[in-house]
Amino acid sequence: MVFIMSVSIILLAHAAFQIRGGGKIIYIDLEEYSDPVEKADIVLVTHSHTDHCDPDKINRVRNSSTVLIAPEECRSKIGEVTPLKPGESMAIDGIKVKAVQAYNYKRFRSPGKPYHPKGMGVGYLISVEGKTIYHAGDTDFIPEMKELGTVDVALLPTGDTYTMDVKEGAEAALAINPKIAIPMHTWGKDTAEFKKRVEAKSSTRVVVLQEGEEYHLD
């Protein structure tokens, strides 16, 4: 008997996703309006802001065996965590999670104070079943994106204000060159321009997910 393994990605809300693969359930950036149901094997948090780290939703899916990877500053909200700094990685039952840089250098809450300063949060590379999924977290288009290596799916924020806008998100997609790019953290803004910019200049396919919609990797 041959068992065919697959990987799927569900947009729950905003920047919150469920990834299913390798026999595991992974959640990323659960927030108030996400509605997770299944218990988690792994929970990832990019940073402590409420729209990425909701204690109630995390506790809903957490059990005694759940691996919770999050920055140190999340401890006060969600308890014991395993922090990974950019460049550090962790293997969990055949799934590899690597933290990468995520920060603002051109978006500020006040002069000289970026919304997401370097060192506050991270993005993640999740490798499962031979596929690599990149969740960028809250970030501008940063030079480190060009050094990510092979990425099958890139989850990229395009909503502006706190993150890349559509134009910058497209530039990031072109630099990363994933097989699939999925916009997130859009704040309800139109993603058609993102899709147009990316697909006009690369072989990357843009997949726009609605909340609750699932994408299966080939």
Where do the PLM segments sit?
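Divalent metal-coordination and catalytic microenvironments
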Residues: 19, 47, 97, 138, ...
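Active-site-proximal segments of metal-dependent phosphoesterases and phosphodiesterases across multiple
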Residues: 147, 153-175
